[in-house]
């Protein structure tokens, strides 16, 4: 992702190892230090599938695995997944993470709205086995950082859920504004999608702040913390059939 990289080792559909890296720290020394633990899986690694939205970072990690594991990485978007997922928009403009999220939920019968809380807050619309498009809104933490940078008297704030709409100090007012503001944004976008498409959807939340907003909607919401990596695994299994 733009902020963090999640690396998961799967065995029989179960995660046996999970590593999180900072995207802006990726270089050979950093990768050797943090990924050396994967060497015990070296001979068992059958396939490495990458879901990248930062091309330069992907190139460095791809070279690392080629050099130290003698294993090639494949980028999800470069694979032919047309029989797995029908893409109804310009595929070149879909981030690999959003594509992986869509692949993760498709079941050929239900409609889904996936909300991914990351650097951006993404909404993706999936009908049966088709990716129909989505909405991109500013990410919460990114917006908080920009507010602090642009407004001299606004401090850096670690975002927390607010129970009171009216804040009693600057920090509580900011948390209130962002929590209730984004709750309204999320609710309005989802209901607008439902109204415009005239369809029923299952709502899936994923990403770092997903649990915080789960109960802010009147609609039923399911949390899937490993949605993206599960989608990558599903694509890998499809290709190995």
Which residue ranges define each predicted feature?
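Gly/Thr-rich phosphate-binding beta-strand-loop-beta motif of the actin/hexokinase/Hsp70
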Residues: 1-16, 105, 109-131, 147
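N-terminal glycine/serine-rich phosphate-binding loop of ATP-dependent small-molecule kinases
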Residues: 2-81
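Glycine-rich phosphate-binding loops at beta-strand->alpha-helix junctions
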Residues: 4, 51-60, 176-179, 199-216
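Adenine-nucleotide phosphate-binding core of ATP-dependent small-molecule kinases
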Residues: 18-19, 23-24, 162-199, 214, ...
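Short beta-strand segments
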Residues: 51, 76, 114-120, 204-206
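Conserved phosphate-binding/catalytic loops in two-lobed NTP-binding clefts
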Residues: 70-82, 218-233
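Conserved phosphate-binding catalytic cores of ATP/NTP-utilizing and phosphoryl-transfer enzymes
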Residues: 82-112, 231-241
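Glycine-rich phosphate-binding loop plus the immediately following alpha-helix
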Residues: 103-109, 132-176, 235, 239
């Amino acid at each position: 992702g733009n902020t963090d990289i999640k690396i998961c080792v799967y065995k029989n559909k179960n995660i046996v190892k999970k590593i999180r890296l900072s995207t802006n720290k990726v270089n050979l020394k950093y990768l050797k230090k943090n990924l050396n633990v994967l060497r015990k899986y070296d001979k068992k690694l059958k396939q490495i599938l990458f879901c990248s939205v930062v091309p330069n970072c992907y190139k460095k990690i791809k070279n690392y695995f080629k050099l130290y594991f003698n294993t090639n990485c494949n980028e999800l978007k470069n694979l032919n997944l047309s029989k797995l997922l029908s893409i109804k928009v310009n595929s070149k403009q879909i981030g690999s993470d959003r594509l992986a999220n869509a692949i993760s939920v498709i079941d050929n019968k239900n409609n889904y709205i996936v909300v991914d809380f990351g650097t951006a807050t993404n909404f993706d619309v999936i009908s049966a086995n088709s990716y129909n498009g989505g909405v991109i809104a500013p990410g919460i933490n990114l917006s908080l950082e920009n507010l602090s940078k642009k407004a001299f008297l606004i401090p850096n704030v670690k975002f927390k859920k607010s129970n009171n709409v009216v804040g009693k100090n600057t920090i509580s007012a900011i948390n209130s504004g962002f929590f209730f503001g984004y709750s309204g944004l999320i609710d309005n976008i989802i209901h607008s999608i439902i109204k415009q498409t005239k369809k029923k959807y299952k709502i899936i939340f994923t990403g770092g702040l997903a649990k915080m907003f789960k109960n802010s909607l009147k609609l039923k919401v399911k949390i899937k913390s490993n949605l993206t990596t599960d989608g990558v695994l599903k694509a890998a299994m499809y290709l190995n059939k």
